[in-house]
Amino acid sequence: MDQAALRAGISPDAIVSPAAFVAPGASIAAGCRIGPGCVVGPDCVLEEGVELLAHVVLDGRVRLGAGVKVFPFATIGLPPQDLKYKGQPTGVAIGARTQVREHATIHRGSVGGDGWTRVGSDCLIMCVVHIGHDCRIGDGVILVNNIMLAGHVEIGDFAFIQGGAAVQQFVRIGRMALVAGMSGVERNVLPFGRVKGYRAKLHGLNTIAMRRRLGLSKEQVMTVARAVHDLYRGGRPEEHVAAVAAAHPGNPHVAEVLDFARDRGRHGLCPFGRLGEDDELDG
């Protein structure tokens, strides 16, 4: 194939290493840099300023937002690990300025979802993280090294998942939640919740994020903490939503927690763990 045809979808302002392979049909915007050993499939779209450092593989329908940076040996858009998948045209979409570090794997969606695995903007996906098919990752999420997300996991904005954690399929993790390292998450995690353990349990609130990112006072954090205490006061938390809502009218942060709790999904909420000296739920 002649060079003019090969570059038909490549901006003249993009820099592509002669040791990279960009398939005809790929769209490479201005300011992109594609390093040696990279492979970019024909259905990939790279917006302005995307950087693939070296030995990165993009396959299937991949959409990388402006300023995304992908480090060596990461793979994005390979087929899902789903025996029902038979080659349907599914994909991965990643928002602007997200970084994907070495050896991370992000699989394309499946026909069991809407066909897309989605990662938001301004995320940090550290080394050897696996994001399974049909996951939904919000903006500003940090996934530390060696995390495993099964298919259809949902993670809210600004959540922080520490290294080595494993999350079961269809689990939902709320906004600004914190999952401790090496935890096994089998049930949903409330917004602002802090969970840990081999079978993860709620051990407090992510009070640092609530204060720094939301600007909440200690008293405001304590109000949310009391609502969470009441939610877990015997029986299933979902059974207490109405009573807790009545006790905290007009509080948007309590309302966010309760809206999340109402949708039990497939797994329900993480159980409440016994608080220890390293835990806090009262801010």
Regions from the PLM with identified roles:
Residues 4, 9-201:
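Structural signal for interior beta-strand "rungs" in well-ordered beta-sheet cores
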Residues 1-13, 18-19, 31, 67, ...:
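Terminal amphipathic alpha-helical/low-complexity segments used for targeting or macromolecular assembly
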